[in-house]
Amino acid sequence: QAEVPGALMIGEEFAGFENMTLPVLHGGLGFTHMWNVRWTEAMMNYFSLAPEYRAYNLDRLVFSATTAFEEDYILPLSYKEFVYGKRSLLEKFPGLEAEKMAGVRSFFGFMMAFPGKKMSFMGSEFGQVSQWDYHSQLEWDLLENEGHRQMQTCIRELNHIYARNCPLWQDESNKGSFYWIDPGRTDPDVVAFSRIDEEGDELLV
């Protein structure tokens, strides 16, 4: 970083090593960001459940907030989630095609609102059906289908909403930038929380 100011150094860690993004001078490894692989695992486990079973597994969704501020996290959808028989993001969701697409839209909505930088995987934004194959290109022909075009539009609009609303990305490593309003106690199918920016402005989600 001394040679290239502003460069990002992103770590991936599975062994539970702490202080990945703490400066070296303070005993850390000095990465600017770290993949939050625990978040990805919890989200895939939760959203892959049929809707009628999610209420009984809400802890997978809610617990992710308890560790969201341990590092400067990136919420990753990496290629590792979509190869070797793990299926595409769309195919991880239960139900018929329309239900799968609704699930993906819901997932991306939660992801955009949750603390942490975002990293999606190519094709997920329009509902790629096949898992990733480096021998072939993305299934662009799917965009001839209205449902896939609508998903692409939805994700594009979510990106615009994210960029326009400072509470969704400012000061997000600070625990004070997030608090639960209702973590599913009133209705286990609905969670509500607040995001707060550096000026104290709130966005209710």
Model-identified regions with their sequence ranges:
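Conserved alpha/beta catalytic core and glycan-binding cleft of carbohydrate-active enzymes
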Residues: 1-134, 163-205
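Active-site beta-strand/loop architecture of penicillin-binding DD-peptidases
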Residues: 138
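A short acidic, glycine-rich active-site loop
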Residues: 96-98, 142-149
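Catalytic cores of secreted or luminal carbohydrate-active enzymes
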Residues: 146-171
